[in-house]
């Protein structure tokens, strides 16, 4: 048995909503392969369960898949603040986030996280940086 087979046999199912979002992302968006998928999503959810953050910063929302997975792992009162710099993503992403089962745990913000996140005045307990890879050092 390969490691991939082992992981797939031992993680939670993706769920219908995330499956439909992943499918729509790959069918409707030009760079659909950039989306986090089942394995990455379940890992993010597990990490949130383990770390138990109150406020999560996500840089790079894209389709919202990873934001939903992060929010699934949050305890009551927790929040994911997810930033997408590309305003052309909003028409696709916002409805998926707002109609998700964890919509109340996600704040979707169009803008540059580097300048906008500090304006929120929030102490983040966890960050998932999946935006512009060329600026990772500046972002951190």
Q: Which sequence ranges carry the predicted segments?
A:
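A short alpha-helical cap/connector motif
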Residues: 1-126, 133-140
């Amino acid at each position: 048995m390969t490691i991939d087979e082992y992981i797939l046999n031992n993680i939670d199912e993706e769920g219908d909503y995330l499956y439909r979002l992943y499918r729509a992302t790959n069918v409707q968006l030009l760079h659909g392969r950039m989306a986090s998928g089942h394995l990455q999503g379940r890992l993010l959810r597990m990490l949130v369960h383990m770390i138990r953050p109150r406020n999560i910063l996500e840089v790079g929302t894209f389709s919202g898949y990873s934001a939903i997975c992060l929010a699934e792992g949050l305890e009551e009162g927790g929040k994911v603040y997810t930033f997408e710099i590309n305003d052309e993503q909003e028409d696709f992403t916002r409805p998926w986030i707002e109609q998700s089962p964890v919509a109340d745990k996600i704040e979707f913000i169009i803008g540059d996280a580097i300048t906008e996140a500090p304006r929120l005045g929030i102490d983040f307990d966890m960050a998932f940086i999946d935006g512009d890879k060329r600026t990772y050092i500046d972002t951190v």
